[in-house]
């Protein structure tokens, strides 16, 4: 038993130090990159023939908070208008968000290339020549498939409907993707750091009824922000969120063809190409990024995080239950895509990591003579060190949370919404902040347990799916939506 305890203590020491180092890298990168607005992009200032054309695809489902402001943010980009096409996508005209999309099209169609795509009017799926079985069950892919096929130019920017971006974002993402200015390294895939902002009015607040937004913004601005930045700084593995991603259509079309990509199984030759290749999967954002990461494109880097630009997601009236359900879904759809990272995730949370650190300091004989070690091997010492480590962790989270929510890196102007201003309106009293921090930390392990160990189904965009070990999904009939029959014959992508 002493050998076992010593082994656990040594493992805890190594693990906690690794986590502390990763956090340090993330904190350094956050403060280095988000302290001021990034420099103006290069690509918009090139000659007209040298400016790459960008097709922005925005999938929409339901009335998201501040939907109008989020959608028009891509129409207010400083990128040349004749080089920017915006495709708004919705499942049907019965969707409550449809009038908002129509309003955007009416207001901007005279000056911008903006189009509205309705899934039920997609000739690939409906009409005399269509068949709903031509695509898998993924509702997001089915939503944007037509817009992707109609894309102008080669660059695709998929950005969720509930994301707001500043005016220079398109240009800086193109710079990163294409390697501007000349001599810079181009990438296969670029993305942004996501950040949630709860815009629920104070008079509508209630812990269980609206506290989910506070928990979500706490997660995104602390644990997620630190590790997302660190992993993308080191670049040892793909780490993407899927809120705002840019890549080349030519790359994705070619790399989803087994005849041109040897890492794909030959049996996938009958699948459609491009974005449609991933319609059998619920975790399409990660799988697209993963495929581009693992596929050879000479002269290109794998993934590039566009440091300095934030993808802001306003949230409103989200219950604690909805936060838990969203986190469970997030973990379950990624369980089989990044299994190792999912299994070790509890160890990067404050409660577990600090306990491993405290156990290591109060258990292992770090000196030949135990009497020379200044920390006693007692329960009192263990809990004291744990509390001290938690306090330091919370202090760092408090600092980085307020730093990110100050929105210092955002180019502010008259068109910037209140949630992007970083002003007093969005600041939280310390009491409210610490309650949200404690709540998120306490919920982390139960959420992980429920997601990873206690189920394989997720509900997304009104449809219930079963997630399989080969990363494919099948929609479950009689669970809110009619099954389209796709999913049972899907093979592995990776």
Curated annotation (Swiss-Prot):
**What is the protein name given in its UniProt record?**
Ceramide glucosyltransferase
Which ranges of this chain reside in the Lumenal compartment per its record?
Answer: 1-6, 359-380, 450-494
Enumerate the UniProt keywords alphabetically: Glycosyltransferase, Golgi apparatus, Lipid metabolism, Membrane, Sphingolipid metabolism, Transferase, Transmembrane, Transmembrane helix
Which Gene3D superfamilies does this UniProt record tie to the protein?
A: Spore Coat Polysaccharide Biosynthesis Protein SpsA, Chain A (3.90.550.10)
Please state which protein family the record places this protein in.
Belongs to the glycosyltransferase 2 family.
Could you name the Gene Ontology cellular component terms for this entry?
Answer: Golgi membrane
Pinpoint motif (Q/R)XXRW by residue range: 326-330
> Motif D2 located where?
160
The EC number on file is: 2.4.1.80
Residues exposed to the Cytoplasmic side: 28-337, 402-428
Q: Which classification does the entry list for the species? A: Eukaryota, Fungi, Dikarya, Ascomycota, Pezizomycotina
Tell me one Pfam family matched here: Glyco_transf_21
Role this protein plays: Catalyzes the final step in the biosynthesis of the membrane lipid glucosylceramide (GluCer), the transfer of glucose to ceramide. Glucosylceramides play important roles in growth, differentiation and pathogenicity.
Annotated membrane topology is: Multi-pass membrane protein
């Amino acid at each position: 038993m002493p050998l076992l305890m010593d082994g656990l203590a040594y493992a805890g020491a190594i693990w906690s130090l690794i986590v502390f180092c990763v956090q340090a890298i993330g904190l350094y990168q956050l403060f280095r990159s988000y302290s001021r607005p990034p420099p103006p992009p290069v690509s918009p200032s090139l000659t007209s023939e040298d400016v790459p054309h960008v097709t922005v695809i925005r999938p929409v489902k339901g009335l998201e908070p501040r939907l109008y402001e989020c959608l028009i943010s891509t129409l207010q980009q400083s990128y040349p208008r004749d080089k920017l096409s915006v495709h708004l996508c919705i499942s049907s005209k019965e969707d409550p968000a449809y009038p908002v999309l129509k309003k955007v099209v009416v207001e901007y169609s005279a000056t911008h290339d903006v189009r509205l795509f309705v899934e039920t009017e997609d000739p690939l799926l409906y009409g005399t020549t269509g068949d709903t079985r031509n695509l898998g069950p993924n509702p997001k892919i089915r939503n944007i498939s037509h817009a992707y096929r109609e894309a102008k130019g080669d660059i695709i920017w998929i950005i969720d409907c509930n994301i707001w971006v500043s005016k220079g974002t398109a240009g800086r993402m193109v710079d990163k993707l294409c390697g501007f200015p000349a001599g810079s390294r181009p990438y296969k895939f670029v993305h942004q750091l996501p950040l949630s902002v709860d815009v629920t009015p104070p008079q509508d607040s209630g812990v269980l009824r609206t506290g989910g937004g506070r928990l979500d913004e706490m997660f995104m601005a602390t644990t997620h922000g630190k590790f997302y930045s660190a992993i993308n700084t080191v670049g040892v593995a793909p780490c993407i969120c899927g809120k705002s991603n840019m890549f080349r259509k030519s790359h994705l079309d070619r790399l989803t063809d087994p005849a041109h990509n040897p890492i794909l199984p030959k049996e996938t030759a009958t699948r459609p190409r491009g974005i449609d290749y991933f319609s059998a999967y619920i975790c399409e954002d990660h799988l697209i990024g993963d495929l581009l990461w693992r596929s050879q494109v000479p002269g290109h880097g794998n993934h590039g995080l566009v440091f300095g630009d934030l993808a802001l997601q306003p949230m409103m009236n989200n219950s604690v239950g909805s936060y838990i359900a969203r986190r469970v879904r997030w973990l379950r759809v990624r369980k089989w895509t990044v299994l190792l990272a999912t299994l070790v995730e509890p160890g990067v949370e404050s409660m577990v990591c600090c306990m491993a650190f405290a156990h290591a300091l109060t258990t292992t004989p770090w000196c030949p003579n135990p009497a020379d070690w200044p920390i006693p091997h007692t329960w009192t010492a263990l809990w004291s060190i744990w509390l001290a480590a938690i306090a330091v962790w919370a202090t760092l989270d408090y600092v980085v949370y307020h730093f990110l929510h100050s929105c210092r890196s955002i180019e502010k102007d008259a068109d910037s919404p209140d949630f992007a201003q970083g002003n007093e309106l969005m600041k939280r009293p310390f009491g409210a902040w610490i309650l949200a921090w404690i709540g998120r930390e306490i919920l982390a392990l139960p959420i992980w347990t429920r997601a990873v160990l206690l189920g394989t189904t997720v509900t997304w965009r009104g449809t219930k799916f079963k997630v399989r070990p080969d990363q494919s999904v099948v929609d479950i009939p009689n669970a809110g939506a009619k099954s389209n029959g796709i999913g049972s014959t899907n093979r592995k992508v990776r």
